[in-house]
């Protein structure tokens, strides 16, 4: 009986644990120690700094089963997923690692024992082939003389990629740094499958499959390309769980292993598919794994960075579900089955299951609204295509209008052997960016043209005034030697207490003054390494080289400090209340409010807003110390400091901590203790884009002012309702109930009036060939009452044709009613269409009742006058 995928994973970890390895949990799919990496894509990612000597662990041997995603950037397998036997967006990498401990001998012996040992994987030895780097005689001899593999099954691979050390069997972390030869182990599925051994012309076949790569990090590559031996060589290995499961379960495709077989059946169940060999089932089964685990690790669908990759994968899965005939949202229903097949490796996913399902369902519902229309447009374009390439402009229109990622369009085209002009798509995308840049300008911003060679030293963390020297002056973006009273200018100082706008915090205001002059600073901005004070010279004159006294508006700075510190508390509270997927997407901190944009998939519930507000105020009452430390970027990350993805940081960073509650990288100005904030109140929560929410809040005096404003408003409402704050709710409910009752009575009166009006109108009907025709424009009648009147008139008149109209504020409402015995000759829909066309509108309906609207009230009398002749012709 073959092992299950879960048993194989556990056996691997157990084996290396028995060899003295520390079992280390899988790290997040979102790398926390490498901002250049989109997703964790290898087992060694979490140990990168250990290999580089920047981090130390209390163990020298480790083993993991690491979750990995390859669906963006350099490692992009997306287009092949579902169509080949082994490509996935998500996979698990089994690995064992030595940090300066054992090396080639033990690494090879461990691998052989696990693969062929009777108590472990027990693979037939004659089915295993190995490759080594061409000059790695040591590894070759271990395989041949110690392990006993025949020479014909050991293959040397040289520099087969066109440069020294550029080889399938030489691993490099980058252009410089740790590197070394590797040995790979292949499994021979047998001669009934096409393919040749590695290094031969047929190596891309499916007969010989790489199952394990063992990297020997023994060199440090220098910038000039020379290789220096590492003092402590290390080992990094990787074996795809899905691949070894296919071997041990005696199947040729990863999609036939137990884990995927179960998922594919679940996909068929939720989509209604019956053909289990359909490749769309494989696509969806793969994609639910990457999507669910990415969301569990904090990624939310969006239009940028990791969120956009996730959105692309979700939409590809939804489109394949559509191809299978899925009528309703289905993708989120696969999270439960996924949790079931992942076993112990899915514990974190199980904890977040409901949240992951909600994110997937929301995203699927949003895309479903445009999917059908987008596919129809694409089908139309492809049906008219003369060549074999879809133009980039059309692909861009699908992206821009219907949210189709270009690779989804390429997926559809691929099924019809059509290519997509991706270069043309990129050109159209760049043109849109250019137009956006141009349309965002509201006139010349001369200050944006300022170029300053000098640097300014910011000293405003600890002081709000100091003496400085003017190093540059700019007027309308041009450098000048001096300015005079009344001139707008930018003043650059050698040092300053003024904070320049950065990280969402606005620039300081204040005054620069000196001997006979005063310069009012209205804003402060960065110009490269210089800090510019923007404002107007109120009096006197000022020249380059002159000394000034720089004074920041202290009261304004204090309010900004409180708001900025509250923003950090709120960020931490949001992650606690909503989940760790919450990430900052933008912020504004000024002296009046704080505004914070963050990733979240739905509007916050009132209870969640209250929980965040209460949590922040609880931290304020704790009066936590707010401390800053300058440290290495790596040390800051190790401390758990939150950083923004895509943001570039210096090697030395400023870490802001608020007790044990919040730690972030931040260069802004802050309160001394959380208690200084006083009070925190959320004013609003709203959406700004798909997957992005916005909170606006106030602190301190602003929070108290908002409480007073609400109290005053409640007092005014209470007086209007002749009540007080204690019974206000009861008074409002009573007033609303009374209002509903009065509206009901008013509606009844209107209906009675309509019936009376109908009785008066019936006498105005004329007889045309035995059918009563009534055409009338009614003044002061609500449009919705016309239908009631037509029904009543039809009962009164018998065989009849009725057209009623009313005009309110220039808008025309029309209705036509035809008794059923006349509809074979006159149809209400045709009649109302004829009238509506004359008043600038259109409409339709059933043969016996139809409604329309129009915009040309002046044309209504003539339109109604045309009805009699039109009806006569029909009868």
UniProtKB/Swiss-Prot annotation:
Consists of three domains; the N-terminal catalytic domain, the editing domain and the C-terminal C-Ala domain. The editing domain removes incorrectly charged amino acids, while the C-Ala domain, along with tRNA(Ala), serves as a bridge to cooperatively bring together the editing and aminoacylation centers thus stimulating deacylation of misacylated tRNAs. Homotetramer. One of its GO terms (cellular component) is cytosol. The keyword Zinc applies. The keyword RNA-binding applies. GO terms for biological process: alanyl-tRNA aminoacylation; negative regulation of DNA-templated transcription. One of its GO terms (molecular function) is ATP binding. Zn(2+) binds at residues 564, 568, 666, 670. This is Alanine--tRNA ligase. Keywords: Aminoacyl-tRNA synthetase, ATP-binding, Cytoplasm, Ligase, Metal-binding, Nucleotide-binding, Protein biosynthesis, RNA-binding, tRNA-binding, Zinc. Its main location: cytoplasm. It catalyses: tRNA(Ala) + L-alanine + ATP = L-alanyl-tRNA(Ala) + AMP + diphosphate. It is found in: Cytoplasm. Pfam families: DHHA1 (PF02272), tRNA-synt_2c (PF01411), tRNA_SAD (PF07973). Catalyzes the attachment of alanine to tRNA(Ala) in a two-step reaction: alanine is first activated by ATP to form Ala-AMP and then transferred to the acceptor end of tRNA(Ala). Also edits incorrectly charged Ser-tRNA(Ala) and Gly-tRNA(Ala) via its editing domain.
């Amino acid at each position: 009986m073959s092992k299950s995928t879960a048993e194989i994973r556990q056996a691997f970890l157990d084996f290396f644990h028995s060899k003295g390895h520390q079992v280390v949990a899988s790290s997040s799919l979102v790398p926390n120690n490498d901002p250049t990496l989109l997703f964790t894509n290898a087992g060694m990612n979490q140990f990168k700094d250990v290999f580089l000597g920047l981090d130390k662990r209390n163990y020298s041997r480790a083993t993991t089963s690491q979750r990995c995603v390859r669906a963006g950037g350099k490692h992009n397998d997306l287009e092949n997923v579902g169509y080949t036997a082994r490509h996935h967006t998500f996979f698990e990498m089994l690995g064992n690692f030595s940090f300066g401990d054992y090396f080639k001998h033990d690494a090879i012996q461990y691998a052989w024992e696990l693969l062929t040992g009777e108590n472990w994987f027990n693979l037939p030895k004659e089915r295993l082939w190995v490759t080594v780097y061409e000059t790695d005689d040591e590894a070759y001899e271990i395989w041949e003389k110690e392990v006993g593999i025949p020479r014909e099954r050991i293959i040397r691979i040289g520099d087969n990629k066109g440069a020294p050390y550029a080889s399938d069997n030489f691993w490099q972390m980058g252009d410089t740094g740790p590197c070394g030869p590797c040995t790979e182990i292949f499994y021979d599925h047998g001669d009934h499958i096409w393919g040749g051994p590695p290094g031969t012309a047929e190596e891309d076949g499916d007969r010989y499959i790489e199952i394990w790569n063992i990297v020997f990090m023994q060199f440090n590559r220098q910038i000039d390309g020379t290789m220096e031996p590492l003092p402590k060589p290390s080992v990094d290995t990787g074996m795809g769980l899905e691949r070894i499961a296919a071997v041990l379960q005696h199947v040729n495709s990863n999609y036939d292993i137990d884990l995927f077989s179960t998922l594919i059946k679940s996909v068929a169940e939720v989509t209604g598919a019956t053909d289990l060999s359909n490749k769309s089932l494989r696509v969806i089964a793969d994609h639910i794994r990457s999507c669910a685990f990415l969301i569990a690790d904090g990624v939310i669908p969006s239009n940028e960075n990791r969120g956009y990759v996730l959105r692309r994968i979700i939409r590809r899965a939804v489109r394949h579900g559509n191809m299978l005939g899925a009528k309703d949202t289905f993708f989120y229903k696969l999270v439960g089955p996924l949790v079931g097949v992942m076993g112990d490796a899915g514990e974190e996913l199980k904890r977040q299951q409901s949240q992951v399902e909600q994110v997937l369902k929301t995203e699927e519902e949003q895309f479903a609204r445009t999917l059908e229309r987008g596919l129809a447009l694409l089908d139309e374009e492809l049906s008219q295509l003369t060549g074999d390439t879809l133009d980039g402009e059309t692909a861009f229109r699908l992206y821009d209008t219907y949210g189709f990622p270009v690779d989804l369009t390429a997926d559809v085209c691929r099924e019809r052997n059509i290519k997509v002009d991706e270069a043309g798509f990129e050109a159209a995308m760049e043109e849109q960016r250019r137009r956006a840049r141009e349309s965002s300008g509201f006139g010349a911003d001369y200050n944006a043209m300022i170029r300053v060679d000098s640097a300014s030293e910011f000293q405003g963390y600890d002081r709000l005034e100091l003496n400085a020297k003017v190093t540059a002056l700019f007027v309308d973006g041009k450098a000048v030697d001096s300015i005079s009273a009344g001139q707008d200018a930018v003043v650059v100082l050698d040092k300053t207490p003024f904070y320049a706008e950065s990280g969402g915090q606005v620039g300081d205001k204040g005054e620069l003054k000196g001997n006979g002059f005063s310069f009012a600073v209205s804003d402060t901005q960065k110009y490269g390494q210089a800090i510019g004070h923007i404002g107007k010279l109120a009096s006197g004159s000022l020249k380059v080289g002159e000394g000034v006294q720089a004074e920041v508006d202290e009261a304004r700075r204090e309010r900004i400090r409180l708001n900025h510190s509250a923003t950090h508390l709120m960020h931490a509270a949001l992650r606690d209340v909503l989940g760790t997927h919450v990430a900052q997407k933008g912020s504004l901190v000024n002296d009046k409010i704080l505004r914070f944009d963050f990733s979240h998939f739905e509007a916050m519930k009132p209870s969640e807003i209250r929980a965040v507000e209460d949590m922040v105020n609880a931290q304020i009452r704790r009066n936590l110390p707010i401390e800053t430390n300058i440290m290495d970027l790596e040390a800051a990350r190790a401390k758990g400091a939150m950083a923004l993805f895509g943001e570039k940081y210096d090697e030395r960073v400023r870490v802001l901590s608020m007790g044990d509650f919040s730690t972030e990288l931040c260069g802004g100005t802050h309160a001394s203790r959380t208690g200084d904030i006083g009070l925190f109140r959320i004013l609003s929560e709203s959406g700004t884009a798909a997957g992005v929410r916005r909170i606006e809040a106030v602190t301190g005096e602003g929070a108290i002012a908002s409480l007073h404003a609400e109290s005053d408003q409640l007092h005014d409402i209470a007086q209007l309702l002749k009540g007080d704050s204690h019974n206000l709710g009861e008074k409002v409910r009573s007033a609303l109930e009374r209002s509903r009752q009065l509206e009901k009575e008013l509606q009844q009166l209107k209906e009675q009036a309509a019936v009376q009006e109908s009785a008066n109108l019936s006498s105005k009907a004329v007889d045309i060939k035995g059918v009563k025709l009534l055409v009338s424009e009614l003044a002061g009648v609500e449009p919705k009452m016309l239908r009631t009147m037509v029904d009543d008139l039809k009962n009164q008149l018998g065989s009849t044709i009725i057209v009623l109209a009313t005009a309110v504020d220039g808008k025309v409402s029309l209705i036509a009613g035809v008794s059923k015995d006349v509809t074979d000759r006159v149809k209400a829909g045709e009649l109302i269409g004829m009238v509506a066309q004359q008043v600038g509108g259109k409409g339709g309906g059933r043969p016996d009742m139809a409604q329309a609207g129009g915009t040309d009230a002046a044309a209504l009398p003539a339109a109604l006058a045309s009805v009699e002749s039109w009806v006569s012709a029909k009868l």
